Amino acid sequence: MARAKFERSKPHVNIGTIGHVDHGKTTLTAAITMALAALGGATGKKYDEIDSAPEEKARGITINTAHVEYETPNRHYAHVDCPGHADYVKNMITGAAQMDGAILVVSGADGPMPQTKEHILLAKQVGVPNMVVFLNKEDQVDDAELLELVELEVRETLDKYEFPGDEIPIVSGSALLALEALVENPKIQRGDNKWVDKIFDLMDKVDEYIPTPDRETDKPFLLAVEDVLSITGRGTVATGRVERGTLKVGENVELIGLKDTKATVVTGLEMFKKTLDETMAGDNVGVLLRGIQKKDVERGMVLAKPGSITPHTKFEAQVYVLTKEEGGRHSPFLVGYQPQFFIRTTDVTGKIVSFTHIQMKNPSSVAEEHSNKMAMPGDRIEVTVQLIYPVAVEKGMRFAIREGGRTVGAGVVTNILEE
């Protein structure tokens, strides 16, 4: 079937919902699509349509991530509903990289919870630049002063993780009451229902506060592969988000990382099930590759302009070691520690060859002679990492360190080391 063409008439922004489990992220996502559908800017999705999101296999863990699209009068949005469960933080690390901004959902009845903090920290580490807060379940809070206290606590928490807590817009409301009103009457307009109006207010704030990102369209093309599909009779499609640059049908690209670098030609591009002649930074796109077998491509490789990036196994980085309260390790680790490094969309085993301290959580508790042999939870360290496979690594790139299904550190590459 011939695909409709994707129209690029408004600025495009990638956002997502983050926050603690059961604080209402999915309900809010549904309410936003239904409210904007009433204005003709979306296809309304009910809660169960988003909640039963297609399963994505990430390293043996099945993760559901819902992608929905909608428009406000000013912009086109692609919205990811990030799973809130602590085990799904992996996807936050690969998925939150897909966000130009986030809507942090906090239950007004409960206030910030451990995962709220973990998601704010991760948003900082994976480079989500801006967020707007939705204080949900307002209908369950009888006392306006309590809601103000929760708002204050949210602002303090944001400050702690170096977001501008005083400036960030906070909108309170009830996603559930808005959604129920919209399910009952899908044509609700502004001014008809106070709960639905709060959803419109939230989207106004998202429009105003989350800047249209400066797309990195002038840099050389790069896409981190998230998934690979085989289309009978057409070939192999690599999907992912264009990190930078632009790409036209017919151009040459290289597949880099994990295996030997391969050169290929782009024979087609698709976005939201529509064909494109050209894709640019920020798009979630499928790239059809000539002469490439499905087995040649895997999650974690990058597609890039030939010669623009090379694979490496050794680099220096600055790393923050999470405390146990943040879900990290309970005990220190030593030189020679071998965790998993999550780089763009890949996890690769690597070894910490050496480290020096930048900032110690409890300087007095560790004897001097141990200080550069032992990294304690809460420390900030400069490390040298040796990966077992080469991947496309570059200066300024962020990554997470994982062990046994949990995030134990977050870092940024400061220097590439030649072998």
From Swiss-Prot:
Report residue spans for region: G1: 19-26
From the UniProt entry, list the residue stretches annotated as the region G3: 81-84
Record GO terms (molecular function): GTP binding; GTPase activity; translation elongation factor activity
Alphabetical keyword list: Chloroplast, Elongation factor, GTP-binding, Hydrolase, Magnesium, Metal-binding, Nucleotide-binding, Plastid, Protein biosynthesis
Q: What is its EC number?
A: 3.6.5.3
Any GO BP annotation: mitochondrial translational elongation
Q: Where in the cell is it found?
A: Plastid, Chloroplast
Q: Does the keyword field hold rRNA processing?
A: no
The record, for Pfam families, names: GTP_EFTU, GTP_EFTU_D2, GTP_EFTU_D3
Tell me which residues bind Mg(2+). 26
InterPro entries recorded: EF-Tu_GTP-bd, EF-Tu_GTPase, EFTu-like_2, EFTU_2, G_TR_CS, P-loop_NTPase, Small_GTP-bd, T_Tr_GTP-bd_dom
* PROSITE patterns documented for this protein: G_TR_1, G_TR_2
Ranges where the tr-type G domain occurs: 10-214
Q: Which residue intervals make up region (G4)?
A: 136-139
Q: Which GO CC terms are listed, alphabetically?
A: chloroplast; mitochondrion
Q: Where is this region: G5?
A: 174-176
Q: What PANTHER family does the database record attribute to this sequence?
A: ELONGATION FACTOR TU, CHLOROPLASTIC, ELONGATION FACTOR TU-RELATED
HAMAP family documented for this protein: EF_Tu_B (MF_00118_B)
Q: Please describe what this protein does.
A: GTP hydrolase that promotes the GTP-dependent binding of aminoacyl-tRNA to the A-site of ribosomes during protein biosynthesis.
Q: What is this protein called?
A: Elongation factor Tu, chloroplastic
